[in-house]
Every structure is written in structure tokens, then in C-alpha cells.
């Protein structure tokens, strides 16, 4: 994942807090760090840290933009802030997917290169249902979701029994800027 810069992190947390106050939503707090997910590795069958370190050291920080409010539909819909997919963001995802996600037992097919939609989760899980999705979208639809951000890190999140999701390691993107 990439954690968000401070201003966008604060914007997303304010939305999370507003939805918790108004609708009682708390599922998003299971991973209490606003972030962009590139892939999910559920089992550590290989040593992934050196792969992530190599990608981080060879990738320069990149500029991205949030552009819209979206919904992944289905039995358990997800409301998200969508990012415009640009070539640098797609290249970072490609590097992570091919070097990391293809090398492990990855059950999160939604993150493969064909299906991946870069996004920041706003609401998911059992919080959303047919009776509240309309009022939630009505509340969110009039907010400005256009933000420019610098993606400057790759962060490894890990589920620790008794603690929940924690930051295991945060790596700075440190590749040469002149190549881009």
C-alpha cells in the first residue's frame, strides 16, 4: 500500500469520522490508515521484503490525482475515492504485481492488472446496505474529491493478533527523478 500525504489523510479521516457519527460506520477502521492498495498478500510463502525494498529504491515519487466518488457494486458494496490512473501509477502497480503478487498465493483477484482500480476506501463491509447507501451517497456526492497528491512511499501493513492491522514497514520511494 501507499499511505496518503497528511492533507489527504486528514480529509479521508474526516469523512470516516463523519460517517461513523452519522451512520455508525466503523468497518473502515479495521485498517485505520487511509491508503491506496496495490495488492494483498495473504500468506507469506516467499520473502517479500527484499522485493518491495528493490521496487521502492528504484521508483521515484509520483504525482496522482483523486478524481471521483465511486462504488464497487455487489452483495457487499464499497464506496471509494477513485484515482486517475496515469502511466507512473500503472508502472508502480505493474512492478508490484509482477514481482510480488504473482509470486505468492494471492486471493485478491480484484487487484490484478486487468481489474485494478486505484482507490481509497471510504466505506465497506457490513456497514453498507440497501437502506443506507442512498443517504450515504447523498451526503458524499457534494464534496470535492479532486485532490493532487504525491505518492512517496510503499508501506507494508500486517495483521497482528490482538493488535489488528499495523504498519510493519514504511519505505520511501527513492528512484532517480531524471528517468521520468
Where do the PLM segments sit?
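Short histidine-centered catalytic/ligand-binding loop motif
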Residues: 78-85
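Generic structural "secondary-structure junction" signal
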Residues: 43, 71-74, 151, 173-175
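A short, Trp-centered hydrophobic/proline-enriched beta-strand micro-motif
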Residues: 4, 11, 148, 153-158
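Short proline/glycine- and acidic-rich turn/helix-capping motifs at secondary-structure junctions
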Residues: 68-76, 111-116, 152-163
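Basic, often amphipathic N-terminal segments
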Residues: 1-65, 86-145, 163-180
Amino acid at each position: 500500500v501507499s499511505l496518503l500525504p497528511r492533507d489527504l489523510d486528514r480529509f479521508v479521516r474526516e469523512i470516516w469520522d463523519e460517517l461513523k457519527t452519522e451512520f455508525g460506520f466503523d468497518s473502515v477502521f479495521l485498517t485505520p490508515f487511509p491508503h491506496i492498495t496495490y495488492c494483498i498478500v495473504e500468506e507469506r510463502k516467499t520473502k517479500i521484503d527484499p522485493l518491495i525494498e528493490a521496487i521502492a529504491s528504484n521508483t521515484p515519487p509520483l504525482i496522482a490525482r483523486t478524481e471521483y466518488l465511486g462504488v464497487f457494486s455487489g452483495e457487499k458494496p464499497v464506496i471509494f475515492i477513485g484515482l486517475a490512473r496515469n502511466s507512473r501509477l500503472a508502472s508502480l502497480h505493474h512492478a508490484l504485481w509482477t514481482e510480488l503478487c504473482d509470486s505468492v498465493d494471492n486471493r485478491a483477484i480484484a487487484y490484478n492488472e486487468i481489474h485494478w482500480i486505484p482507490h481509497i476506501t471510504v466505506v465497506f463491509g457490513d456497514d453498507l446496505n440497501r437502506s443506507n447507501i442512498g443517504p450515504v451517497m447523498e451526503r458524499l456526492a457534494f464534496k470535492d474529491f479532486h485532490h493532487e497528491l504525491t505518492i512517496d512511499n510503499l508501506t507494508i501493513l500486517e495483521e497482528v493478533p490482538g493488535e489488528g492491522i499495523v504498519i510493519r514497514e514504511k519505505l520511501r520511494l527513492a528512484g532517480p527523478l531524471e528517468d521520468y
